[in-house]
Amino acid sequence: MHLGWWKDEVEPFAAQWETLSRAAGAKKTAFLLGDFNSEADVRGEGYDLVLCSGWQDTYRLAQQRDEGYTVMQAIDGWRDAPDAAAKKRIDQIWCSQAIAVKSTRVVFDGLQEPQVSDHAGVLIEL
């Protein structure tokens, strides 16, 4: 999935999240994953909204984890941000309930696997 930015005037994150979480929330165990366009370390925006909605960040649940950054440099859509060159964890895997997660790691970041996009992927092992 690919969500909009928190302050997007046309398709704001909060409205997209409300629709998405309502559709996925009826499932016993559901996973939502992809580009959330919401930095995990920025408070009061998309990441916190998802967390406060009762969803679990599998990165935080994992027994083993790497740094988790899926964006390593300035990319389209973020180039004008004051911290454009900073590493970001905007691609996430969320679960509708707390589960046991053995590990999480970034993949296709150009280090262990070829880079295939301006974002790296995320892989979890349950």
What are these regions (language model features)?
Residues 1-126:
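Active-site regions of metal-assisted phosphoester/phosphodiester hydrolases
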